[in-house]
């Protein structure tokens, strides 16, 4: 994460201002008359703090003369060139399924219902999956490790039948309309110049992956063999993957050619140059078009928009690119990408994954990520690990956060803070929703207009004391009370709408 640099004068001025404002806010609130509750079924308000997640809270009448913060939303003012929302979800990783498999069948079904049922909790409807192994696979593998098998006679997804396929089927049981997109972390080893699944040595304290010094890769080089025969075979490899999963009743509707193509990692990875990716798209594009599968550029994990610009300058490659997947430091390129390529759909393709502690402070950081992506035009948002064992340790020794943590010994589970943050979005914001601009003194907010006319406001209070916010949306006004250090959602429905909180 890149840090903002402050001068000492800026820091002192800002700190003093915040302290004075905070003291004034507390004094003013103590002198205000208590707000009067408003019993209007059109309003639903839910709050989450570190200690008390997902609490239905009171909405108040805007009857006093003034409030400390205000938030105004005009449903006609959308974020410029933002596409309607396409979906939310996480990534189907092997360790996600092996952790959930430690639970009883009843508990596992309860988790999947909470995550995927369209009328219940998070309502996930669009998820990611790997093509072969990723860093949360049980081991390194691809669908064809037979050296020189250009006809893909030995292609097989049998490895996935124990993990990914049942994981996805379990989700589809609750969400039959689930959409999927996929990307590889590495091609088969024999298609790479180093003939190995990884490109870096293990970091200190992590599991040795056995890579030799001459096999180490570097950013800015094509590790994939840049020859037509290999491009053609790899494109057909993608096609065989699509076909094999369709035979299992699982339809993948979009692919990206490479996860984090700039990063040489100690786990499955493959570096590409943008020029190399453009060449590959000449082959991948037609294979996917024949199957009615979209192609996005990505995933982009560097804050350099020229990486995308280079591909889009190749007209043949650009003709196949419908969107872009952005993650990690790629977020720094997002505003420029959105300005330069307004026709491209933008997904936040992998939320930054933390360190396995799943603490509340990191959830606050994830809120800032969410705010940045949606204000920059994203129409899809994907978390990374749906579930892990306690500690979130990967096969290659990296601990990461997850929505659900499983204690394998006790056979119990818990929903982590990040889950509730994401639920504040996905429980209320529907497919087809538009991201709206906001204005007022309450800037820590996001706003959406659903296709059914309902409005959804997400608000964050970072202060150590509660705050009152007066909200004005489409002629409707209300006051909400944000608990100290909290995230909240206010849903405003039209006349004769049903209750907003489903579960």
Residue ranges and their predicted role:
Residues 427, 438-474, 485:
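Carbohydrate-binding surface patches
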Residues 4, 25-52:
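C-terminal segment of N-terminal export signals and the immediately downstream linker at the start
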Residues 236-240, 244-254, 261-351:
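Active-site neighborhood of glycoside hydrolase catalytic domains
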Residues 406-453:
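Glycan-recognition and catalytic regions of carbohydrate-active enzymes
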Residues 1-19:
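N-terminal secretory signal peptides and thylakoid transit peptides that target proteins
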Residues 483-503:
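C-terminal beta-strand-rich structural cap/linker in extracellular carbohydrate-active enzymes
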Residues 348-420:
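Aromatic/acidic polysaccharide-binding cleft in carbohydrate-active enzymes
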Residues 55-250:
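N-terminal catalytic cores of secreted or lumenal carbohydrate-active enzymes
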């Amino acid at each position: 994460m890149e840090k903002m640099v402050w001068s000492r004068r800026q820091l002192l001025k800002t700190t003093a201002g915040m302290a004075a404002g905070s003291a004034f806010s507390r004094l003013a609130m103590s002198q205000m008359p208590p707000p009067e509750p408003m019993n209007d079924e059109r309003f639903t308000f839910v709050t989450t703090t570190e200690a008390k997640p997902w609490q239905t809270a009171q909405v108040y009448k805007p009857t006093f003369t003034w409030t400390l913060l205000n938030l105004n939303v005009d449903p006609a003012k959308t974020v410029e060139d933002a596409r309607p929302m396409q979906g939310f979800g996480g990534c189907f990783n092997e360790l996600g399924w092996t952790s959930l498999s430690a639970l009883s069948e009843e508990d596992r079904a309860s988790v999947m219902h909470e995550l995927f049922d369209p009328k219940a909790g998070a309502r996930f409807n669009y998820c990611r999956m790997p093509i072969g192994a990723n860093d949360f696979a049980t081991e390194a593998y691809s669908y064809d490790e037979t050296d020189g098998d250009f006809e893909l006679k030995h292609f097989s997804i049998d490895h996935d039948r124990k993990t990914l396929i049942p994981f996805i089927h379990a989700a589809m049981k609750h969400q039959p309309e689930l959409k999927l997109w996929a990307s590889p972390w590495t091609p088969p080893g024999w298609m790479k110049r180093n003939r190995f699944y990884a490109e870096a040595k293990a970091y200190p304290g992590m599991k040795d992956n056995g890579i030799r010094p001459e096999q180490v890769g570097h950013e800015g080089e094509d590790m994939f063999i840049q020859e037509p025969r290999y491009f053609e075979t790899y494109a057909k490899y993608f096609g065989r993957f699509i076909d094999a999963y369709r035979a299992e009743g699982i339809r993948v509707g979009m692919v990206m050619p490479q996860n984090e193509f700039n990063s040489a990692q100690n786990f499955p990875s493959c570096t590409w140059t943008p020029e190399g990716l453009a060449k590959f798209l000449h082959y991948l594009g037609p294979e996917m078009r024949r199957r009615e599968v979209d192609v996005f550029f990505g995933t982009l994990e560097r804050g350099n928009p020229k990486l995308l610009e280079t591909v889009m300058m190749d007209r043949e490659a650009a003709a196949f690119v419908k969107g872009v997947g952005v993650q990690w430091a790629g977020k720094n390129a997002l505003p420029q990408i959105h300005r330069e390529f307004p026709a491209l759909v933008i997904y936040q393709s992998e939320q930054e994954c933390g360190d396995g502690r799943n603490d509340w402070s990191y959830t606050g950081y994830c809120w800032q990520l969410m705010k940045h992506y949606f204000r920059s035009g994203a129409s899809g948002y994907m978390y990374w690990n749906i579930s892990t064992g306690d500690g979130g340790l990967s096969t290659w020794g990296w601990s990461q956060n997850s929505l659900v943590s499983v204690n394998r010994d006790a056979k119990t589970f818990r929903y982590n803070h990040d889950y509730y943050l994401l639920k504040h979005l996905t429980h209320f914001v529907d497919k087809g929703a538009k991201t709206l601009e906001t204005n007022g003194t309450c800037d820590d907010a996001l706003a959406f207009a659903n296709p059914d006319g309902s409005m959804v406001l997400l608000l964050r209070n970072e202060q150590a004391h509660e705050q009152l916010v007066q909200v004005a949306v489409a002629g409707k006004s209300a006051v909400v009370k944000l608990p100290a250090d909290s995230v909240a959602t206010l849903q405003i429905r039209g006349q004769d709408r049903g209750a907003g909180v489903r579960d």
